[in-house]
From Swiss-Prot:
Transmembrane segments: none annotated. It comes from Picosynechococcus sp. (strain ATCC 27264 / PCC 7002 / PR-6) (Agmenellum quadruplicatum). This is Ribosome-recycling factor. The gene is frr. HAMAP family: RRF (MF_00040). It is found in: Cytoplasm. One of its GO terms (molecular function) is ribosomal large subunit binding.
Length: 182
């Protein structure tokens, strides 16, 4: 595995961690809160964003306009059953979600969840590092590279891993600050 390939794989992990963070609720309305919501529509689990237009008219409201009015009750049910803790208001054509201010306890829960998501990202980085180091050791064993080259490559792999681990820590700090801001 080349260092450029290693960086590319680790960057994908950073992006996946960022997407996970985006699904965590902060005090503001955001369409990305609904990214994980799937709706049972004609017997198939369908992502909400492919069934409806989602907008945020203000900082505390999410407006959902299904393309098919027949799916209103399905969308409403999916949101009610989700772990978002939001109550949908169905007016016959649209669904409004009012985002109440987060309680201190809920904010602390979300910070813990963000920490778990960050740890999952770090585990993924360590797995990528392990695979890269295994490749280097195989090359050394097959006499494709010298012991010194192997050690140098392993050091480079560790430096890249440390760099990306720091990026995840920075993303976590930003998200924690965002969650705890009242």
């Amino acid at each position: 595995m080349q260092l450029s390939e290693l960086r590319e794989n680790m960057q994908k992990t950073i992006e996946a961690t960022q997407r996970s963070f985006n699904t965590l609720r902060t005090g503001r309305a955001s369409a990305s809160l609904l990214d994980r919501i799937t709706v049972e529509y004609y017997g198939a689990e369908t992502p909400l964003k492919s069934l409806a237009s989602i907008s945020t008219p203000d900082s505390s409201t999410i407006m959902i306009q299904p393309f098919d009015r027949g799916s209103l009750s399905d969308v409403e049910r999916a949101i009610s059953m989700s772990d978002l803790g939001l109550t949908p208001n169905n007016d016959g054509t649209n669904i409004r979600l009012n985002i109440p201010p987060l309680t201190k306890e809920r904010r602390q829960e979300l910070v813990k969840t963000a920490g778990k998501l960050a740890e999952e990202g770090k585990v993924a980085l360590r797995n990528i590092r392990r695979d890269a180091i295994d490749d280097v050791r195989k090359q050394e064993k097959n006499s494709d590279i010298s012991e010194d080259e192997s050690r140098s490559l392993q050091d480079d792999i560790q430096k890249v891993t440390d760099e990306f681990t720091t990026k995840i820590d920075d993303l976590l700090k930003i998200k924690e600050k965002d969650i705890m801001t009242v």
